[in-house]
Amino acid sequence: MEIINVFLFLIILFLVKDFVKKNKKIHTKSPSGPIAFPILGNVVQIRFWELFKIQEHELFGGYSKKYNGVVRAWFGERLFFFVSNYDVVKYFQKDENFHNRPSVLVPGWRYASSNGLGVMSSSDDKWKRAKSSVSQSLRVRTTKKLMEEKAIEFIDSLEKISNNNEIFYPKGHIQGYACSMLFKYMFNQDLSVESGMSRTIGNAVEHVFGNLSKLTAFDCFEIFSPLYDWFFTRRLKGCDIVRQIISSQNENHLKSIDPSKPRDLMDDLLIEYGLNEITKEDTMQINQICFDIFGPAVGTVTITMNWVILQLCNRPELQEIAYQEIKKAVKDDEYVNLNHKQNAPYIVAFIKETMRLCSNGFGLPRTAKNDQICGDFFIPKDAIIFINYLEISQNEEIFKNAKEFNPTRYLDESLPVPNIHFGVGQRACPGRFVAIDKMFLGISNLLLKYKLKTQNGEKIDDSIQFSVSLKAKDYGIKLEKRI
């Protein structure tokens, strides 16, 4: 009996100590947060509110308002900060102290990033070299013609659906459009927008996005570390599907590359990393850079275009404004090209407004190299920080009438709005301008050829589904050919 009492005492002591550790402030300006329970921390609140259909982005939106835009949260034994205070975010934009990704990554991210490689999850010199390589390739390689050709192929592939009065399900077709364009740029390989490979890759990326956004015990407790690879190999199968494709392309390029005539991004990376002197780690880095590009180039573009089409259907009066602008810009041309973009600012504004209200979530984590005071808040060294872009986008002090869907807010230069659609500061997406062009071509050509209608005349459900990028529920629409 005495042993049991001692055992119970030790358990209680541990729980009290853990509770104090999780809730005690280490600095007078330490951010506050909801009560963190022993062992599980704030996972308790997440799971509790899930019972009432409250998703993570909604829960942390409420916490953001309560705790002045910087929320402390414990997930098991891991400490996070969710930041929507824009004055604090400005420090992340400008200060090199916040340019790195966490060295102790959440295990799911660790697995998806090959333990902190690539252009999205690496830090310091590794990241700077990867970013420079990708940026240089984007500058050298002219993607204008490629994007315009793929946009035409995308639109032409919808002819059969329209002629047969079939329901158009945008997501799969957008995945094909994004994948086929990326394959040509990255591997110099032609891939039809309707190919099975495009759908396979698109589904794999969606699978990774969805599962990375869901907390598991393996993400929260170091004790499970021996089982990480076993668990995430099964949970993140989409990673391995994409990695196998990239690895095969890497091997084929090594056999056929002509250093004097690089064909694509893979050639550019192989040359940058030394070609015949490439180490195993270099190969992993090259492959991870390509993997990282698949995420935003396929996943984020698909999610955003899917949202844009939904908003155009639900707002026919705004769809008509966008169509008239496109029609006027193209004049007698059969398709929209990038030369028309300067005369079609409304559709670009429509895309940005959709991203602001719908698809921007928490982004990727960053960390603090050293302790730092950011305005009214103390951010400790090695903190894992997520920027809550959705909450920033709904802040009335930053965006006037923030809850209102109003693309024209991006057309008034006298009222500047933050450009947070692709991240902030040095860690913003290096391919953001290409992504906007790709979406502009796809959406504007779709509008030029078809009037987009809901199936039954009622609005499509626009409730947000939590993911790495916030996504819409799957839906179908009618395509009415314009005369």
From Swiss-Prot:
Q: Which CDD domains match?
A: CYP1_2-like
Q: Tell me which UniProt keywords the record has, alphabetically.
A: Heme, Iron, Membrane, Metal-binding, Monooxygenase, Oxidoreductase, Transmembrane, Transmembrane helix
Q: Does the keyword Transmembrane apply?
A: yes
Residues the entry annotates as binding heme = 429
Q: What class of enzyme is it?
A: oxidoreductase
**Which parts of the chain span the membrane according to its record?**
1-21
Required co-factor(s) are: heme
* UniProt-annotated location(s): Membrane
Q: Name one GO cellular component term.
A: membrane
Catalytic activity, EC:
1.14.-.-
Top-rank taxon, per record? Eukaryota
Q: Which Pfam families match?
A: p450 (PF00067)
Main subcellular location: membrane
- Membrane topology of this protein: Single-pass membrane protein
Q: Does this entry carry the keyword Transmembrane helix?
A: yes
Q: Gene3D superfamilies in the record, alphabetically?
A: Cytochrome P450
Q: Which GO terms describe its molecular function?
A: heme binding; iron ion binding; monooxygenase activity; oxidoreductase activity, acting on paired donors, with incorporation or reduction of molecular oxygen
**Family according to the record:** Belongs to the cytochrome P450 family.
Q: Extract the PANTHER family matched here.
A: CYTOCHROME P450 307A1-RELATED, HEME-BINDING MONOOXYGENASE FAMILY
Its recorded name reads Probable cytochrome P450 517A1
Q: Which gene encodes it?
A: cyp517A1
